[in-house]
């Protein structure tokens, strides 16, 4: 029991630290000498990297952020943690990405890391959400709209997949976290002022 509790706490800490790896911030600093927290949307995620650093760095940041989430839950699975502890490890990674200790608790909007988490937990659901994201972005070319639609679809897809209650609950929590992080984007979407891909405005 003590060993299991220690392992769980260790994985939660590792999950948070993985999520807190500031890939977007480092891309801005190393490649352009800028602090992404002071640029565009203020997010350190791939979308803000795309707008302020470039396409190549944005793709690398996206892949790293996906990897952070996937690695966290795969580590939890590899040591035999139950479903609830797996999802808590995933949420720890999500929290690390949104509130990284290294950057004054100001990070990304959790979309890429969230995708990684659900690819690790239930890859068919993760792929379905990514497909939904890509379908919306190909039509409207608005990243935030695609993120919001995918976030709303996530718990529904998880429920329909017949996954465990732990996975369904974490999908709902993650969805709400992503929507909360996109609240200003949602306001602009409703106002019709949210920028499309390629724009330099806030996003």
From Swiss-Prot:
Pathway: Lipid metabolism; phospholipid metabolism. The chain crosses the membrane at residues 1-21, 84-104, 117-137, 157-179. Its main location: membrane. The keyword Transferase applies. GO terms for molecular function: acyl-phosphate glycerol-3-phosphate acyltransferase activity. The keyword Chloroplast does not apply. GO terms for biological process: phospholipid biosynthetic process. InterPro entries: G3P_acylTferase_PlsY. GO terms for cellular component: plasma membrane. Keywords: Cell inner membrane, Cell membrane, Lipid biosynthesis, Lipid metabolism, Membrane, Phospholipid biosynthesis, Phospholipid metabolism, Transferase, Transmembrane, Transmembrane helix. It is a multi-pass membrane protein. Its EC number is 2.3.1.275. It is found in: Cell inner membrane. Catalyzes the transfer of an acyl group from acyl-phosphate (acyl-PO(4)) to glycerol-3-phosphate (G3P) to form lysophosphatidic acid (LPA). This enzyme utilizes acyl-phosphate as fatty acyl donor, but not acyl-CoA or acyl-ACP. Probably interacts with PlsX. Belongs to the PlsY family. PANTHER family: GLYCEROL-3-PHOSPHATE ACYLTRANSFERASE-RELATED (PTHR30309:SF0), INNER MEMBRANE PROTEIN YGIH (PTHR30309). This is Glycerol-3-phosphate acyltransferase.
């Amino acid at each position: 029991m003590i060993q299991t509790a220690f392992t769980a706490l260790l994985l939660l800490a590792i999950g948070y630290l993985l999520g807190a790896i500031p890939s977007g911030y480092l891309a801005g600093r190393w490649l352009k000498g800028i602090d992404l927290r002071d640029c565009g949307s203020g997010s350190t995620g791939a979308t803000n990297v795309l707008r302020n650093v470039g396409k190549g760095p944005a793709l690398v940041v996206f892949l790293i952020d996906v990897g952070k989430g996937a690695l966290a839950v795969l580590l939890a699975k590899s040591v035999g943690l139950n479903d609830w502890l797996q999802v808590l490890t995933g949420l720890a990674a999500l929290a690390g990405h949104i509130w990284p200790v290294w950057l004054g608790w100001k990070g990304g909007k959790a979309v890429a890391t969230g995708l990684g988490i659900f690819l690790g937990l239930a890859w068919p659901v993760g792929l379905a959400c990514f497909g939904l994201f890509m379908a919306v972005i190909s039509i409207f070319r608005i990243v935030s709209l695609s993120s919001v639609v995918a976030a709303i679809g996530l718990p529904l897809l998880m429920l329909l997949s017949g996954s465990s209650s732990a996975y369904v609950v974490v999908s709902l929590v993650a969805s709400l976290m992503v929507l909360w992080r996109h609240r200003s984007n949602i306001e602009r979407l409703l106002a019709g002022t949210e920028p499309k891909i390629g724009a330099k405005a806030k996003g």
